[in-house]
């Protein structure tokens, strides 16, 4: 009876998590819909890869919306890092993707990982865009000037000057373990990122 009760409770918690994710996703989409620029369907990938799994991740220092400067090297030996490049503020998929990471912060914590969100937008634009999302738990960084320099270094700068929708998972030694240069028109599945986080030590 006790085992049955635990199994039932686990099932209920799982259902609540899924429903919460769906509702949150819908509410965020509704909240932004009147302010979102609709670019139409874009070429899925428009960049030349420069890095691969096993490479050392290039260091960078970028300004954050919070006012501080964030360097990748400050996490060396301390944290695993996930870099999330998104193309642009005020676009449909990007406006859903980053708030979704709030739902899995506990998984990042479990695997001693930090998320760094990067776009080529300037700080005022990023502030105006992310403020209505509520409290994002991760640093939001501007790769505005020199324009797209970090995206270029990581091989994810598109020909039109925005970055790809890309994820890089980097271990505490600064080694790239996983790269997903995603179809720019689609949001990467959270489940896939969670699987990669589960491989971290």
Give residue spans per PLM region:
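N-terminal targeting signals for export/organelle localization
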Residues: 1-63
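Short active-site neighborhood of thiol/selenol oxidoreductases, capturing the structured segment around
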Residues: 71-101
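Short loop/turn microsegments at loop-to-beta-strand junctions
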Residues: 57-58, 80-82, 164-166
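Thiol-/selenol-based redox modules, centered on thioredoxin-like
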Residues: 162-201
């Amino acid at each position: 009876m006790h085992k049955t009760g635990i199994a039932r409770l686990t099932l209920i918690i799982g259902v609540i998590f899924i429903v919460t994710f769906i509702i949150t996703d819908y509410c965020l989409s509704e909240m932004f819909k009147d302010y979102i620029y609709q670019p139409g369907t874009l070429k899925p990938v428009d960049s030349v890869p420069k890095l691969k799994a096993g490479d050392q991740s290039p260091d960078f220092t970028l300004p954050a919306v919070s006012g501080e400067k964030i360097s990748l090297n400050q996490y060396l030996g301390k944290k695993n890092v996930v870099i999330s490049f998104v193309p642009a503020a005020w676009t449909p998929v990007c406006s859903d993707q980053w708030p979704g990471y709030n739902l899995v912060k506990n998984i990042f914590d479990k695997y001693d990982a930090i998320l760094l969100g990067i776009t080529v937008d300037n700080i005022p634009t990023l502030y105006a865009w992310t403020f209505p999302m509520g409290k994002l738990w991760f640093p939001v960084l501007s790769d505005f000037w020199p324009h797209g320099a970090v995206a270029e270094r990581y091989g994810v700068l598109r020909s039109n000057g925005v970055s790809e929708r890309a994820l890089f998972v980097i271990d505490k030694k600064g080694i790239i373990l996983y790269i997903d240069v995603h179809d720019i028109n689609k949001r990467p599945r959270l489940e896939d990122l969670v699987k990669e986080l589960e491989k971290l030590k």
